Amino acid sequence: MNRRRRLLAAMLGGLLASPRAEAQATMPLETTGSTLCEVRGFATDRDPRGSNLRAAPRADAPIIGHVPPRSNIGQNTWTGAEFEIVGSKDGWLLVHNGDQDGDLKFDAAHAEDGRGWLSARLVGTTLRVAALRSAPRRDAPLVARLAGDNWGPDSVAVSAVHSCQGNYIEVTTTPIGGKPVRGWSFKPCSSQLTTCDGGITE
């Protein structure tokens, strides 16, 4: 008798939970108050299960998609999914596939839009220009110049991505032989094994 009651309770619980799950799955993407940007990045999450994409820039927002785990391409070299970064808010980045063959996967309600929120802690980028500025504009004061006799900006490790605005991304990075600095970099790329394409100047 107890077994039958438990079975009925489980079935009823599933039925009651279904409308809520469906409502979460169809929750519209929240973009109010976010910045707009046009930069690129890649996934850095070490979790073998990958990362969740959410409907809003907060950890308790409904999950609407998934970023696949990083791939080991040999000799302890890992690469993550690449994507466009089109917005930011409160330490979260709004990421976008860019094309139908992109690595990001979405539920049916959000697949056509192809955007979702990913924690900035799980995102990396490759810097393209030497100037690191105090604000996301060309005339802002320099924080650091990421270049030396034998190295350039794409040789610098980005330890954290914070936000983005326009064609700029805000990062913490460490110049070779220097201390960590935080600032804004112009037009980063998502290359992980090679340098960024040339021809871009701030």
Q: Where in this protein do the model-derived segments appear?
A:
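N-terminal secretory signal peptides and thylakoid transit peptides that target proteins
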Residues: 1-15
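Short linear motifs in intrinsically disordered/low-complexity regions
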Residues: 3, 46-48, 73, 77, ...
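Beta-loop motif signature
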Residues: 25-39, 45-89, 125-164
